[in-house]
Amino acid sequence: MLIIPAIDIKEGKCVRLTRGDFAQKKIYLDNPCDMAVIWRKQNAKMIHVVDLDAALTGETVNFERIREIVNVLDIPIQVGGGIRSVEAVEKYLDIGVSRVVIGSAAVTNPGLIADLLKKYRPSQIVVGIDAEHGVPKIKGWTESSNMQDYELAGEMKKLGVERIIYTDITRDGMLQGVGYETTKRFAEKAGMKVTASGGATTSDDLHKLRSLEKYGVDSVIIGKALYECNFPCQELWYAYEQGLGIDGEFSTARKKECCS
């Protein structure tokens, strides 16, 4: 089970949202690149980056921030958020992004997926399905699609997509545990490789997800739980942050009993 730390960028800063609500935004670091370095020091094997501004506007607002992350790390970076054209995909892949995540466009313009898979490998183009009670949400989670999550996955599979990043919106950023049954249901019906996202909060959640490997769930994206130091043995993280001179009020710079 591959653990993939998440970095969400809004107005150039590293933030986390609660259930995708832009009004419930918490800033963790002014420079997302510093966050990426911290993840790598914690032995991350891949980083998941989302341009939240682009998710709303469709414009690659935080492109330079993402370029900085790619340039400073030696591991694969996957990027999502408002990527709705071949040109946008090319722009990211040209700077060294390993994998591009297509979200809203998979619903509104499935032909884009077909075009991309004619040009790029399936490992470079993945589809993100962000669902609320089984219904995919698009355009920064502000609109609903007219199909079920597994139906969208089926259409993508026909086009040659091999992996879905599946986010349970009801769990995202809530620190209330992973949506095990929801993820299991989706993975069983999709019959594809699945990266789970949304709600993973404790090691128990990771064990639950690992039990879904037989259904294709082989990785998980974790955001707020890591930022809030919910997992044991994050003492190394704390020590490294002090070396960067990061403000002690930054949540993950607080020692917790689990780290002592």
Curated annotation (Swiss-Prot):
<dbReference type="GO" id="GO:0005737">
    <property type="term" value="C:cytoplasm"/>
</dbReference>
<dbReference type="InterPro" id="IPR013785">
    <property type="entry name" value="Aldolase_TIM"/>
</dbReference>
<dbReference type="InterPro" id="IPR023016">
    <property type="entry name" value="Isoase_HisA-like_bact"/>
</dbReference>
<keyword id="KW-0413">Isomerase</keyword>
<dbReference type="GO" id="GO:0000105">
    <property type="term" value="P:L-histidine biosynthetic process"/>
</dbReference>
<dbReference type="InterPro" id="IPR006062">
    <property type="entry name" value="His_biosynth"/>
</dbReference>
<keyword id="KW-0963">Cytoplasm</keyword>
<protein>
    <recommendedName>
        <fullName>1-(5-phosphoribosyl)-5-[(5-phosphoribosylamino)methylideneamino] imidazole-4-carboxamide isomerase</fullName>
        <ecNumber>5.3.1.16</ecNumber>
    </recommendedName>
</protein>
<keyword id="KW-0368">Histidine biosynthesis</keyword>
<comment type="pathway">
    <text>Amino-acid biosynthesis; L-histidine biosynthesis; L-histidine from 5-phospho-alpha-D-ribose 1-diphosphate: step 4/9.</text>
</comment>
<comment type="similarity">
    <text>Belongs to the HisA/HisF family.</text>
</comment>
<dbReference type="Pfam" id="PF00977">
    <property type="entry name" value="His_biosynth"/>
</dbReference>
<dbReference type="InterPro" id="IPR006063">
    <property type="entry name" value="HisA_bact_arch"/>
</dbReference>
<dbReference type="InterPro" id="IPR011060">
    <property type="entry name" value="RibuloseP-bd_barrel"/>
</dbReference>
<dbReference type="InterPro" id="IPR044524">
    <property type="entry name" value="Isoase_HisA-like"/>
</dbReference>
<dbReference type="GO" id="GO:0000162">
    <property type="term" value="P:L-tryptophan biosynthetic process"/>
</dbReference>
<dbReference type="GO" id="GO:0003949">
    <property type="term" value="F:1-(5-phosphoribosyl)-5-[(5-phosphoribosylamino)methylideneamino]imidazole-4-carboxamide isomerase activity"/>
</dbReference>
<feature type="active site" description="Proton donor">
    <location>
        <position position="130"/>
    </location>
</feature>
<keyword id="KW-0028">Amino-acid biosynthesis</keyword>
<feature type="active site" description="Proton acceptor">
    <location>
        <position position="8"/>
    </location>
</feature>
